[in-house]
Swiss-Prot record:
GO cellular component: nucleolus; transcription regulator complex
Keywords assigned: Coiled coil, DNA-binding, Nucleus, RNA-binding, Transcription, Transcription regulation
Compositional bias of kind Polar residues: 206-217
UniProt keyword ATP-binding present: no
InterPro entries linked to this entry: ABT1/Esf2, ABT1/ESF2_RRM, Nucleotide-bd_a/b_plait_sf, RBD_domain_sf
Protein name (record): Activator of basal transcription 1
Subunit structure: Interacts with IGHMBP2. Interacts with ESF1/ABTAP.
Length: 268
């Protein structure tokens, strides 16, 4: 499995290199065609280099000073880090005893425009994976350049991409605000409804909303009701006497019936 993974990675790397070579060849053909059409006048086309790693406290002025040695540098743009990540870093610095004023905003990536794309290609190919600082006392001496030339990429493409990201961020923020507003309204409605219920429980003018159920009277309740009527006590006493007589009669029948049966068995 490890060998298969290595083979797949090698194939991907080879395909990427082939794409870059084809793109460079296509650009060289375009340059040759432009040169043949214009004769001795060559049109200078700007090129953009992507900076994938930006060290802490590395600013656009630093990259302009470092790269302007190799050619004329035009526009430079650095993408600031996410505000949430910055707040976490500030909190960690404050928890570690560091002053928050010393922490400055950092960047995650950048784009550098050269006036001539041939110089941009040469700079990206020669400075990639080399130390950023040439002097020993430079704070970026142990950081390496991570440069890549962007084929057929113009500054307008970058502007469109950044505008799209801003629009997406605004839409996400609007959706989060709307969701928070819906949750707040739902909570307030529940609170108001609970307050109305509490006020209704303490209001004596409102009818009681409790449920009542009627059940059939039991035998004991019926006897008690009959006993409470006039003449009912006598009937109840007679009923109890009759019940006792029935029980006594049955008991005597069982006793004497068993004795008579035993005597009949003894007689031959």
């Amino acid at each position: 499995m490890v060998k298969v993974g290595k083979l797949v990675e090698e194939q991907k790397a080879a395909m990427e290199e082939e794409k870059e070579v084809n793109a460079e060849a296509a650009e060289e053909l375009e340059e040759a065609e432009e040169a043949s059409c214009n004769g001795s006048k060559k049109k200078v086309v700007p090129g953009i280099v992507y900076l994938g790693h930006v060290p802490p406290r590395f600013r656009p002025l630093h990259v302009r000073n470092l790269l302007s040695v190799y050619g004329e540098v035009g526009r430079v743009f650095f993408q600031a880090e996410d505000p949430f990540v910055r707040r976490k870093k500030k909190a960690a610095a404050a928890a570690g005893g560091k002053k928050g004023a010393k922490y400055s905003k950092d960047y995650t990536e950048g784009w550098v425009e050269f006036r001539d794309k041939r110089i941009a290609k040469r700079v990206a190919a020669s400075l990639h994976n080399t130390p950023m600082g040439a002097r020993k006392r430079s704070p970026f001496r142990y950081d390496l350049w991570n440069l890549k030339y962007l084929h057929r990429f113009t500054w307008s493409h970058l502007s469109e991409h950044l505008a799209f990201e801003r629009q997406v961020r605004r839409q996400r923020l609007r959706a989060e605000v709307a969701q928070a507003k819906r949750e707040t309204d739902f909570y307030l409605r529940n609170v108001e409804q609970g307050q109305r219920f509490l006020a209704a429980d303490g209001d004596a003018t409102r009818p009681n909303s409790s449920w009542t159920f009627t059940q059939r009277p039991t035998e004991q309740e019926l006897r008690a009701q009959k006993g409470a009527r006039p003449g009912g006590r006598e009937r109840a006493r007679l009923a109890t006497v009759q019940d006792q007589a029935r029980s006594n009669r049955g008991l005597l029948a069982r006793i004497f019936g068993a004795s008579l049966l035993a005597e009949s068995r003894k007689e031959p």
